[in-house]
């Protein structure tokens, strides 16, 4: 999965913020500190994992193989989204931003990710793309933007990857199509 390790980092950030202390980062996790585990996740995403998750060196966005997000599982078959899914980029941004509190290199990288989201995910008029479709090895700049409206783009706002008020309003307005009494659908009609 591309998202679960990043959710661990975001959940840790939320805990640190709620506790008002980063002491949990020194907790022992099988011989490594939690801090070391989180840094290891980021570094493996940067270098590339054995299962194909890798950072695009040009854009700093994360490539995700098919069937690696919550939405495109293979059993049963879901919505294939091989390439650069927007929620993975939002989680990646948040992970880097959190670790950037202690390591300036990660903060700088998070800013590159935010700039790439702005550059590549808003190519279609009136839309934030759900995914930039690409095969392994294809950079984000050559990926094909997806115009489907899905709730994944909301993470770009809630995790702080998109902060421009006009872009945030665009995402929220488009997501209104997904609202139903009591919740939000995963796909528009």
Regions found by a protein language model. Give the residues of each.
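Bulky hydrophobic/aromatic packing residues
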Residues: 7-10, 70, 77, 92, ...
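Inter-helical turn/loop segments and adjacent helix faces that build the functional surface
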Residues: 15-32, 96-108
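Acidic/His metal-coordination segments adjacent to aromatic residues that form catalytic metal sites
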Residues: 1, 61-83, 134-142
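Hydrophobic or amphipathic alpha-helical targeting/insertion segments
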Residues: 5-27, 38-42
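Replace the tail clause
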Residues: 24-75
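Catalytic cores of carbohydrate-active enzymes
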Residues: 39, 43-46, 52-56, 80-85, ...
């Amino acid at each position: 999965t591309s998202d679960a390790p990043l959710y661990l980092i975001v959940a840790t950030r939320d805990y640190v913020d709620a506790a008002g202390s980063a002491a949990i980062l020194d907790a022992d996790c099988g011989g490594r500190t939690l801090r070391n585990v989180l840094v290891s996740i980021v570094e493996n995403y940067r270098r590339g994992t054995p299962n194909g998750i890798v950072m695009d060196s040009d854009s700093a966005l994360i490539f995700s193989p098919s069937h690696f997000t919550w939405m495109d599982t293979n059993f049963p078959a879901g919505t294939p989204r091989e390439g650069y899914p927007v929620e993975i980029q939002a989680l990646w941004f948040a992970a880097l931003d959190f670790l950037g509190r202690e390591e300036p290199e990660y903060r700088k990288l998070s800013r590159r990710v935010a700039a790439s989201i702005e550059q590549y995910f808003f190519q279609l008029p009136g839309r934030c793309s759900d995914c930039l479709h690409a095969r392994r090895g294809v950079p984000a700049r050559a990926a094909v933007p997806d115009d489907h409206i899905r709730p994944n783009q909301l993470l770009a706002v809630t995790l702080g990857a998109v902060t421009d008020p006009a872009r945030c309003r665009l995402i929220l307005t488009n997501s209104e199509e997904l609202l139903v009494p009591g919740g939000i659908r995963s796909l528009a009609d």
